Regions:
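Bacterial N-terminal signal peptides that target proteins for export
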Residues: 1-14
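N-terminal secretory/targeting leader peptides
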Residues: 27-120, 128-307
Length: 307
């Protein structure tokens, strides 16, 4: 009898804990958020979006979901961010530099050689400074749910090996559509050319540009090794993405629904950083196997990139 009573008590306790652990299902409505990204469906960013969708579904009893649209199907970073502000798209994950035209302090994150390693970046982005940046977004029609890692950026090109900072001079490099990127690379003597990411592969294939700059994971996933011979480990900038949701969408959610989205976003952020860092460790080896010639700038040469 005592055993039966104990079992019943434990079962009741478990039921109560389950009820307290998540919002009441009846208070959560059905929502499907379209998430547009410029990168390919097999990129680590896309994997993290799918993880976010899984966590949304699990936490909402299947009522909330996120649907991925990859490879620029819904536009580029600039146009998709604009769509969020207008309320015609629910979510996107642009490079932080995309937000500089709306909020200038976001440009600080893309200054050359700002961070020495990922731990420093995490401390800044997850700390008071990063949170202050996110707090500026609602006035622009956006809600920031966290910072995802793109990684340290490196230069590739089809013309020559880069062994010194001066070797960059004269190269026509595609850069992000941001005044900061344009000014930085023009100062280094390159012909900086702003261009949507979705147009980049074809532009390199047709020799419209000599090269570009991105982290190893993106270089590999986008198969840039097919049209680029040289990669220099320049580590000239650390690049972060911002997980965004439209404020119009956000304002239409209940308190319980917002909590679910925030919790799923936090878990997806941890997943994304872990996944892309693990992949980046192997990406350089894969790029070398694919035929890319990889050089590394000496510390003294890298310091010259701090323009």
């Amino acid at each position: 009898m005592q055993f039966t009573s104990l079992a019943k008590s434990l079962a009741l306790g478990a039921t109560l804990l389950a009820a307290l652990a998540a919002p009441v299902a009846a208070q959560v409505k059905e929502h499907t958020f379209k998430v547009g990204i410029g990168l390919s469906d097999d990129h680590q960013q896309a994997q993290a979006v799918r993880h976010f969708a899984e966590r949304l579904q699990a936490k909402s009893g299947g009522k909330m979901n996120a649907k991925l649209f990859a490879s620029g199907a819904l536009g580029n970073d600039v146009s998709m961010t604009s769509a969020l502000r207008g309320g015609t798209l629910e979510m996107t994950i642009p490079d932080s530099s995309t937000l500089m035209s709306l909020i200038k302090p976001f440009g600080v994150l893309n200054l050359p050689l700002t961070f020495n390693n990922e731990a420093e970046a995490d401390a800044v982005l997850d700390g008071p400074f990063g949170q202050k940046l996110l707090a500026m977004l609602p006035d622009k029609g956006l809600i920031g749910l966290g910072f995802w890692e793109n990684g340290f950026r490196h230069v590739t090109n089809s013309r020559r090996a880069i062994n010194t900072a001066d070797d960059l001079a004269g190269l026509k490099l595609r850069v992000i559509q941001s005044p900061l990127f344009l000014d930085t690379f023009n100062a280094l003597g390159t012909n900086a050319t702003p261009m949507p990411f979705t147009e980049l592969y074809t532009a390199m294939e047709q020799k419209a540009v000599d090269g570009q700059e991105n982290p190893p994971a993106t270089i590999l996933a986008s198969k840039f090794y097919e049209v680029q011979k040289h990669l220099v480990l320049s580590r000239h900038m650390y690049s972060a993405w911002v997980l965004l949701i439209s404020k119009k969408t956000w304002d239409g959610l209940s308190a319980d629904e917002k909590k679910i989205v925030q919790e799923a976003a936090r878990e997806a952020t941890v997943f994304e950083r872990k996944t892309i860092r693990a992949f980046s460790e192997t990406a350089l080896g894969e790029l070398k196997k694919a035929g890319m010639q990889i050089t590394e700038l000496p510390a003294a040469e890298q310091a010259k990139l701090r323009t």
